[in-house]
Amino acid sequence: YTTLFRFMLPSTEHSEINFDHPDTLETELLIKHIIDLREFKAVQVPIYDFSTDMRKTETFTVEPRNVILVEGILLYVEPELRKLFDVKLFVDADADIRFIRRLHRDLTERGRSTESVIEQYYATVRPMQREFVEPSKRYADVIIPEGGHNVAALDMVTARIELLLK
């Protein structure tokens, strides 16, 4: 996520930011990092603190590899980012499964309340899913149904990755 200094909002207004909109992501930095990794250069990745809605001062190092996996629900929204991927996968999960996963994550990892997660889901998560995520899946080379539990699709993806590693 982009730093909140960009939005110039006091911390009391952070909850008003739609963090599910692509504009809140540091897409340019991700593009730079992927290009660097493809050129076999290590990158320093920022660590985002969801409890403060800010970046931490420390980063972590990602070393280049022959295969780079990049995960995120908004990856295919930006055309320049899409161009960097050799294979584009979209893991399709039912809305109720996505919501349950998000609820569990936000309760256990981010200290959120059930009410705040539900409110955010209706206010921003679901609308952004419909506006950006669902339409962007048409750019995927492979759509994996059943939330990633489709064995046949996973076997095909595994075979493709193994080919890339040879």
Label each PLM-derived region with a short phrase.
Residues 1-4:
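Short, small-residue-biased leader/transition segments that mark boundaries at the very start
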Residues 42-43, 64, 114-120:
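Short, basic, glycine/proline-bearing loop/turn elements
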Residues 23-31, 92, 111, 115-118, ...:
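Amphipathic alpha-helical transducer elements in NTP-driven molecular machines
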Residues 63-64, 104, 126-166:
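NTP-dependent small-molecule kinase module
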Residues 30, 89, 140:
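Residue-level signal for inorganic ion chemistry
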Residues 7-56, 67:
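Conserved nucleotide-sensing/catalytic segment adjacent to the nucleotide-binding pocket
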Residues 56-110, 165:
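ATP-dependent NMP and nucleoside kinases share a basic, alpha-helical "lid"
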